[in-house]
């Protein structure tokens, strides 16, 4: 690394502007917080900790709209992950994180380290990770370069998760041109624990040890946090030094060592935190702040894998597979023995001090001496201008696009071959979904389901996000994202508990983009309150742009639900001939942002209609009650492609068919009205089912042995062999990928 600048040179040359620190912030730090010019190391620490990625300085005012508590929440936002009570002294722990910028630059390592980072967040809370999920958004598959990025991303996720022995059980993958220059790779992890083992990222107790454990520190990932707080351009998209490199075998050892310490020797440990974004500085400063303490660190003691690392590099490195512990004085050697057994570094690099000062030593010199609060609590929140986008104002003045479907069968065949709808097994078959043998329902269904061993309980989990609807109507799109996640959870027979999120947007300095963020979070927050699903963790990923072209605003909702007794688990596929088929919810002419619109016009446009959240929630509540009473044979929520696609998906992987009569048009068969399900019910349960749901349930036909989907519509018919439809659906993506060769 080049010679560090003096404080005076920093003031004059302003290198901090390239590190996402503004001149206003630099002056505030110098004049108000420190009363002097910060040195090179200190300036680097401020640039990382004051980045949007670490501080949420632009998004905090919006994030306050989210509810984050209810009777089940044991730990909300602010720790490594959220924790929710699932009864019997047990808790589920979950969180999602984005790794968009690194994955765009280096898809394999970016995706792999995204998985590794979120797993560390889970076991830092004291939980054993039991499942991984993802939410992946790519450009179109007809681009050979995008095919390579898709392959790298999927392999990175699969390799890391498989080596860790943690199943990937659910997720979503979409394709749209808006993600061509900036992929979205959102990783979610779910863990299980006894409530007595919950940990905090806290450093307290004067004289207690600060211990560094795990892999050695290198120069990879330096300024990863600030890299994630700026958009891409042709000039900076080559910042591969900001991408971390992962080692899942090291992480597996780290997981086992940490859980052994937490579960067997809780009296040795004060707090524990993952070294994620901004590396040592973030974990150490946040732990000291949480414990209302000071901290004194000797960076010469930090295990390093590269020679001559500066204090700046050591503190800002985002090398993977590292944790920071606060250990009660006198137990340092005890802790070291545990990590020695696993072949891991475990070094005391500092102590907790009186007061709230953050002091770093390197090469015999003090290289940082600043208040802890200046890094964590004194960040200047920023207010952003908001402006309703011109495209939305114009769309509100125009009539919505209406399709003209002439052949419902041919249209269904085409839709099933669209990349976002088509079978994704070519991707998720690279993930081990059954390792640890707790998986009950794996990828390809509405939600993944795992059993809670030693109990009758199950956990359902899903990730959902549709940027197209949010792009056209951010507030309604935000509601739809939450309602879609809830529908996926309820479709399995589970009660939605809480959510995590990844808020993926463009440059917040653009008034239109900040308006999108504000409006969509407002819609999500309203839906969270209606469904009683607080936001317990998550992250914000802004600046998802390439050369000024922003992605569609894409909030991702990760939701977990509880199945009280797995005997009441409901599958997506139709179960038996003779079962009655019901459409739940009312169907409108909702084509704006739909797969049908994109397929037929090559674009999306129009306005997305609002819907009654309270009514949808009440309907789901009734449906869940019927499931718990054993009155539902199968259930599938309606999403991309509407009822037509959902009916086909319900019959795939079965030998069954359906004979249906609908008061819907050929167009409406593919409408994407929110809050609907297709449900099958045994004949003997039909009367009770109809009585409970009333007008929300429309009998549309029955399941047959024919393996044909036969639908009589108000203006035509659809008759298709299910095996033929399934073959088109299964072969669509492999055919696109082969076209590259």
UniProtKB/Swiss-Prot annotation:
Q: What is its EC number?
A: 6.3.5.3
**Matching CDD domains, A to Z?**
PurL_repeat1, PurL_repeat2
Q: Matching InterPro entries, A to Z?
A: PRibForGlyAmidine_synth_PurL (IPR010074), PurL_linker (IPR041609), PurM-like_C_dom (IPR010918), PurM-like_C_sf (IPR036676), PurM-like_N (IPR016188), PurM-like_N_sf (IPR036921)
Residues involved in Mg(2+) 2 binding: 121, 274
| Binding residues for substrate | 98-101, 120, 244, 318-320, 541
Domain of life from the UniProt record: Bacteria
Give the location in the cell. Answer: Cytoplasm
Q: Name one GO biological process term.
A: 'de novo' IMP biosynthetic process
Which pathway is this protein assigned to? Purine metabolism; IMP biosynthesis via de novo pathway; 5-amino-1-(5-phospho-D-ribosyl)imidazole from N(2)-formyl-N(1)-(5-phospho-D-ribosyl)glycinamide: step 1/2
Q: Which residues bind ATP?
A: 56, 95, 501, 538
Signal sequence residues: none
Q: Pfam families annotated for this entry?
A: AIRS, AIRS_C, FGAR-AT_linker
Any one of the GO CC terms: cytoplasm
Top EC class per UniProt? ligase
Tell me, in one coarse class, where this protein mainly resides: cytoplasm
Enumerate the UniProt keywords alphabetically: ATP-binding, Cytoplasm, Ligase, Magnesium, Metal-binding, Nucleotide-binding, Purine biosynthesis
Q: Where does this protein hold Mg(2+) 1? A: 97, 539
Active site (catalytic residues): 53, 99
Query: A single GO molecular function, which one?
Result: ATP binding
Q: Catalyses which reaction?
A: N(2)-formyl-N(1)-(5-phospho-beta-D-ribosyl)glycinamide + L-glutamine + ATP + H2O = 2-formamido-N(1)-(5-O-phospho-beta-D-ribosyl)acetamidine + L-glutamate + ADP + phosphate + H(+)
- Oligomer and partners: Monomer. Part of the FGAM synthase complex composed of 1 PurL, 1 PurQ and 2 PurS subunits.
Role:
Part of the phosphoribosylformylglycinamidine synthase complex involved in the purines biosynthetic pathway. Catalyzes the ATP-dependent conversion of formylglycinamide ribonucleotide (FGAR) and glutamine to yield formylglycinamidine ribonucleotide (FGAM) and glutamate. The FGAM synthase complex is composed of three subunits. PurQ produces an ammonia molecule by converting glutamine to glutamate. PurL transfers the ammonia molecule to FGAR to form FGAM in an ATP-dependent manner.
**Family of this protein:** Belongs to the FGAMS family.
Its recorded name reads: Phosphoribosylformylglycinamidine synthase subunit PurL
Q: Which organism is it from?
A: Limosilactobacillus fermentum (strain NBRC 3956 / LMG 18251) (Lactobacillus fermentum)
The gene name reads: purL
